[in-house]
Amino acid sequence: MIILGPLFPEEREQEIISASKRGVSNAANNFQWNLIKGIHANTDEPLIVINALPVGTWPKNFKTFRLKDTDWSCGNIVGHEVGCWNIPLVKQFIRMRKVRAWLKKYPRESELLIFTAYLPFLWAVNKLKPEYRVTAVITDIPEFYDMHQVSAFRSLLRRIHCKIVYHFMVRVDRFILLTKQMAVPLHVGNRPYLVMEGMCGDVADEPPVSKPQPFSMLYTGRLNRRYGLELLLQAMKELHDPDIELWLCGSGEMEEEIRAYAAQDSRIRFFGFLPHEEAVQLQKKATVLVNPRTNQGEYTKYSFPSKTMEYMASGRPVMMFRLDGIPGEYDPFLTYIPEESAASSRDTAESLRKLSPSELDEMGARGREFVLKNKNRNVQMRRVLDFIHKEQSDA
């Protein structure tokens, strides 16, 4: 199997973070590595990974102009990282050509697995012979990429990008989706697809234990307005208990605004952008984990926040709004905020504050057990491989 993904080897995380001016997506990289390791655990076949670094363009978003070709390995996994001149359009074209060149070195009967609707990858497989079977793992609808970019020019570019992506996506034979609602906007049609909300990876053997003080609420992820952070900050202003703290970790458009809030309220702690492992350790130290994303906007029903799975695996209680993309089987293990308002968020936080440490630990442990048993990467990738093999035998 050949896997195409915009990822970076885990040991290079600090190097990539240091060169990036706007942070990187820990969630996407972690998802891809869970996918790769889950497949590796379920098959004896060799795994080939062709990757491109998920970084912004030079010089505005990344410090390096020329990204080098690099061969790497991780156990029995062989990787080929395609380099490029890191400037718009040229970057995508070079990556497409290099990915296509690598694919032609492998047998035509190879099974290809593409992570996300990344244009250079779809472009590279578009003209491949039918013997190559292509499965696309789609975690986001292309129309909702870069939603924080609101200029007319950026909107025009996004529309053009979507048209090209959907044109090339016709070559995809089957899909892995995070929610069943995604099938319609992706124009899946009669092509087979499997719904896989997400997965969790390696976690510590023992769940964390609550500490009485302070009562800390943690958010880790992108610091963008569409994720409900303004509402969370407003709720914190309405919480007057001096022993309640709000911890924030990540990077994004609201970073400076959050620094200003933290300067005014000592209960708000901003940790900046942390490597994934440090963010996970911080999750285990928090009292509760919060996802303030509301159910507003069409994109919510097309996404299953990977943050939810990661939060639950940490063993801490999870406080969030009910989202259309999250199946009902998760309901017993999540604390839902009844209304999408700062007041309702405040009230939910106060109700959790009244629980004893042992009650909070029990809530977190039940959610942790659920995802570790039913949604771990080995179980989820076994489902994916069974789905692919079934489609192969039916073809």
Task: Identify the meaning behind each predicted range.
Residues 2-4, 176, 208-227, 232-236, ...:
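Conserved donor-binding/catalytic core segment of Leloir-type glycosyltransferases
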Residues 27, 31, 158, 162-206:
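Donor nucleotide-sugar binding/catalytic pocket of nucleotide-sugar-dependent glycosyltransferases
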Residues 343, 354-389:
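A charged, aromatic-enriched C-terminal amphipathic alpha-helix characteristic of glycosyltransferases
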Residues 283-301, 316:
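Acidic donor-binding loop of glycosyltransferase active sites
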